[in-house]
Amino acid sequence: MVETAVILAGGEGNRLKPLTEEVPKALLKVAGRELLYRTIKQLQDVGVKNFVIVVNKKFEGKVKAFLKEHNFEAEVIPNEHPEKENGYSLYLAKGRIKGEFAVVMSDHIYEKAFLEKAVEGKGLIVDRLGLYINKNEATKVKCEEGRIKYIGKNLEKYDGFDTGFFVLDESIFEVAEEALKEQKKLTMSELAKRAQIPCTEVSGYFWMDVDTPEDVEKAKKYLVKTAIKGVGDGFISRNLNRKVSTRISPYLVDKFTPNQLTVLTFLLGMFSALVAYFSPALGGILLQINSMLDGLDGEVARAQMRTTKFGAWLDSVLDRYVDFAFLSALAMHLKPSWDFMPWVFAALFGSVMVSYSTERYKGAYCEDAYAVIKELRYLLGKRDERIFMIMIFTILGWIKALFVVLAIITNLRVILTIYLVWKKKGNV
């Protein structure tokens, strides 16, 4: 596996203007994060430790400031002739690298699963399927006996698409040097063909190059769409809430931080509790809207690569406030008799304990309960399901029945959770 990567960021980004008038393409934000940040962090996640970044000379200062701001260690090489293309940019790294290394374009976005396989390949990483790209615009590759034979956008017969990711060794610099003696410009495609480097297929994963403003929007939508929670969502979240929130997140991901969205949805939840005291039906509808928006902070955090333990903790704490406040407001509106109060208290404490039981598991065992104890995913009573139930019952005016049902479902779920945790971890 390679431990060094050369990131080519020496171009001028003409097709992205006016977005690249003041910043280099590598520092352009897509879904709230700079392309260069995404590239470095994701390569670090798959084992790359050393970075060499070739940048346009006029943006050298901005790139160095960016690296310092984010505590990234990298050697920066200025390219005073960006018009000589990206093959020349790679040549500038000659003498700075030993052994095998990866080469990646700064304007490409890859999913982690792609990178995990790509760093184990050789030569040009080729995608046979090209599921997420414009195939007419993409650079095509024809391989013969495992090596590049032809490469270009206009090939009629080809084996796959150039992903912009290479795994090379020092011999590539000799080929580049010979080529530059014969010509003034050198692209990576020309260099790859001239060196007849190997082809390695990695197909079916997301990757794309961000070449135009339209590409920025396309990449943003994909990053948000794939930023939903892996496990733990209930039936309503999977089939309703996330279908709504993932359509809203692309409009917010460049404007808000995750914690800002956490606070805003908390305020909406508390407002729904206030409304519920006067109008339970309207309050229930507002609470369901709040539930549909509650995933925005997590989606934005994952799309922006800003997930933090504090953010998850804050979201969990504020959700408990909303749950308790809303049911308390309903109880005050109901003005229950003393003999009904046990149902009210059981519903209140049960609703809080459902979430507390799984959160406390995470604190005790340092792992997600839903990922380890799969039976928990199918137990009725998760927060999204309770809120949807609250909306239905309040619209129908069945407030007393709501407290009874919540009391039974939530506390039964907690009892079953205790049993399942004991069964899985009782001896730990």
Curated annotation (Swiss-Prot):
In this chain, Mg(2+) is annotated as bound at 116
Q: Which pairs of Cys residues are joined through disulfide bonds in the record?
A: none
Q: Which InterPro entries match?
A: CDP-OH_P_trans, CDP-OH_PTrfase_TM_dom, CDP_ALCOHOL_P_TRANSF_CS, IPC_transferase/DIPP_synth, NTP_transferase_dom, Nucleotide-diphossugar_trans
Give the protein's cofactors: Mg(2+)
- Give the reactions, separated by semicolons, that this protein catalyses: 1D-myo-inositol 3-phosphate + CTP + H(+) = CDP-1L-myo-inositol + diphosphate; CDP-1L-myo-inositol + 1D-myo-inositol 3-phosphate = bis(1L-myo-inositol) 3,1'-phosphate 1-phosphate + CMP + H(+)
The membrane topology term of the UniProt record is:
Multi-pass membrane protein
What GO molecular function annotation could you give as one example from this UniProt entry?
metal ion binding
- Positions of the UniProt region annotated as MobA-like NTP transferase: 2-227
Q: Which residues cross the membrane?
A: 266-286, 336-356, 389-409
**Which PANTHER family has this protein been placed in?**
BIFUNCTIONAL IPC TRANSFERASE AND DIPP SYNTHASE, MOLYBDENUM COFACTOR GUANYLYLTRANSFERASE
What does this protein do, in the record's words? Involved in biosynthesis of di-myo-inositol phosphate (DIP), a widespread organic solute in microorganisms adapted to hot environments. Catalyzes the condensation of CTP and L-myo-inositol-1-phosphate into CDP-L-myo-inositol, as well as the biosynthesis of di-myo-inositol-1,3'-phosphate-1'-phosphate (DIPP) from CDP-L-myo-inositol and L-myo-inositol-1-phosphate.
| Official protein name in the record | Bifunctional IPC transferase and DIPP synthase
What species is this protein from?
Aquifex aeolicus (strain VF5)
Q: Which gene encodes it?
A: spsI
